[in-house]
Amino acid sequence: MIRFEIHGENLTITDAIRNYIEEKIGKLERYFNDVPNATAHVKVKTYQNSATKIEVTIPLKKVTLRAEERNDDLYAGIDLINNKLERQVRKYKTRVNRRNRNRGEQEAFASLPEEKEAVEIQNDENEADNEIEIIRAKNFSLKPMDSEEAVLQMDLLGHDFFIFTDRETDGTSIVYKRKDGKYGLIETTE
């Protein structure tokens, strides 16, 4: 069962908003044979120009579903988020079931009703073009540096992320450029 943690920023989450979110995103449960025990973290933020930003993160056992949408209409934004999440689940479902079929394992996801199967087949054909294909591989040594040096190196190379060995912790870390133009840091733990 998917539980919901819904937080509003500059907005009071009414029962109507809560029910709409739970109804729409709760429909994702139909894609699973065993409904995962998961918590959907939903953050709704309104801006001064009345635009809303909806972020949904659902951490599952082997994958994290995440979608973000900005829209002037809160309910339309929730619908768009739901479509994005469904697309992610279908894509993941196709990969997992294909891999399991090759191994002879039981399918982890539920079969959809027949009317949905036709849509699923069409989507699978479109997604076949989007198969993961690694077209280039690089090998390089990680240099010890701090996060500031890594950001400078990343900007110098014109990349969106940079992997390095943290001089202080001796662990592998990643700096990345966020959508808002600021920087993020991912540190590994053992």
From Swiss-Prot:
Keywords: Cytoplasm, Translation regulation. GO terms for cellular component: cytosolic small ribosomal subunit. Pfam families: Ribosom_S30AE_C, Ribosomal_S30AE. Transmembrane segments: none annotated. SUPFAM superfamilies: Ribosome binding protein Y (YfiA homologue). InterPro entries: HPF/YfiA_ribosome-assoc, HPF_long/plastid, RHF-like, RHF/RaiA, Ribosom_S30AE_C, Ribosom_S30AE_C_sf. It is found in: Cytoplasm. GO terms for molecular function: ribosomal small subunit binding. Its main location: cytoplasm. GO terms for biological process: negative regulation of translational elongation. Required for dimerization of active 70S ribosomes into 100S ribosomes in stationary phase; 100S ribosomes are translationally inactive and sometimes present during exponential growth. Belongs to the HPF/YfiA ribosome-associated protein family. Long HPF subfamily. Interacts with 100S ribosomes. NCBIfam families: yfiA. This is Ribosome hibernation promotion factor. It comes from Staphylococcus saprophyticus subsp. saprophyticus (strain ATCC 15305 / DSM 20229 / NCIMB 8711 / NCTC 7292 / S-41).
